[in-house]
Amino acid sequence: MSGFSLSDLESIVAERSTASPEQSWTAKLVAAGQPKAAKKLGEEAIEAVMAAVTGDRDNLTYEAADVLYHLLVVLKIAEIPLENVMAELERRTAQSGLKEKAGRQSS
């Protein structure tokens, strides 16, 4: 198991977001703004879905990494720390998924 974490990736995204857009894909995405970054996240998510549906495990692993990276870029632009997402996941896992979903539908 790797010692690399999503928190590590979040730190790398934050660091690279301040680099020159000519020298960093992360900085280029951040400079392009949320619409571009969100579109790229969507494209990567579709590629991950396609890999899952076709049963291509290696490609799914590759695309899942792209999804996580691009999600962290989108969160960076929105100024939402990964910690907030993890807190939301923790809140949701404190109850069953069906109960949590029902609670969202009645809100």
From Swiss-Prot:
GO terms for cellular component: cytoplasm. Transmembrane segments: none annotated. One of its GO terms (biological process) is L-histidine biosynthetic process. Pathway: Amino-acid biosynthesis; L-histidine biosynthesis; L-histidine from 5-phospho-alpha-D-ribose 1-diphosphate: step 2/9. One of its GO terms (molecular function) is ATP binding. It catalyses: 1-(5-phospho-beta-D-ribosyl)-ATP + H2O = 1-(5-phospho-beta-D-ribosyl)-5'-AMP + diphosphate + H(+). InterPro entries: HisE, PRib-ATP_PPHydrolase-like. Keywords: Amino-acid biosynthesis, ATP-binding, Cytoplasm, Histidine biosynthesis, Hydrolase, Nucleotide-binding. Its EC number is 3.6.1.31. It is found in: Cytoplasm. Its main location: cytoplasm. Pfam families: PRA-PH. Belongs to the PRA-PH family. PANTHER family: HISTIDINE BIOSYNTHESIS BIFUNCTIONAL PROTEIN (PTHR42945), HISTIDINE BIOSYNTHESIS BIFUNCTIONAL PROTEIN HISIE (PTHR42945:SF9). NCBIfam families: histidine_hisI, PRK00400.1-3, PRK00400.1-5. This is Phosphoribosyl-ATP pyrophosphatase. It comes from Rhizobium leguminosarum bv. trifolii (strain WSM2304).
